[in-house]
């Protein structure tokens, strides 16, 4: 999936769909984080956006099931779909993670975006990926993130189920000093989601600093 700060692109699952349409375009609702759920629906409908990558503020995977069902019904009525979710909270508590996957299955979500605070959490997530057949994609948040360096991410995914891949944030990977296009190719088909944004990169106090910019105006 791709996001315009965040536009979002998701890679289709089948070879046939990849040939027909390499990516599907949508919007990451973090972009609309100052709006409530109903306003997000109105915005998407007004601008002809069908695909949403939803954040927990707009649909909480741990909310009461009746609330979740009601919000899904609103999306369905308005021709919208939550086809990805995240960045999702994860835990060493397997039951906590299971609820996230149960939510994703109910919503029809194909990819869950994650950024676990502990590498050991992947043991739980991998079991759920295999049980539910739902992909997860590891997000990067610059060099301050555990996953800011692509080498770390590659080391994780090469030893895990192929349904564990990457959410490549183009702005943040650029801010970390990497060539986004080169990194994309190096992941060799394991990029399942893209956050499309732009940043200019400056050196401040001997550190790389990424500053948000309009797409096409930055260094990404």
Where are these regions (language model features)?
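Acidic/histidine-rich catalytic cores of soluble enzymes
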Residues: 22, 51, 130-219
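Short amphipathic alpha-helices and their capping/turn segments at secondary-structure boundaries
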Residues: 39-45, 67-74, 179-190
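A structural motif
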Residues: 49, 106-109, 191
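Active-site acidic/histidine proton-transfer and metal-coordination neighborhood
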Residues: 5, 11, 39, 58, ...
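Aromatic- and glycine-enriched glycan-recognition loops and surfaces
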Residues: 36-38, 63-69, 220
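Boundary/entry segment of secreted carbohydrate-active catalytic domains
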Residues: 11-38, 43, 49, 55-58, ...
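Glycine-rich, proline-tolerant flexible connector loops at the mouths of alpha/beta enzymes
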Residues: 53-76
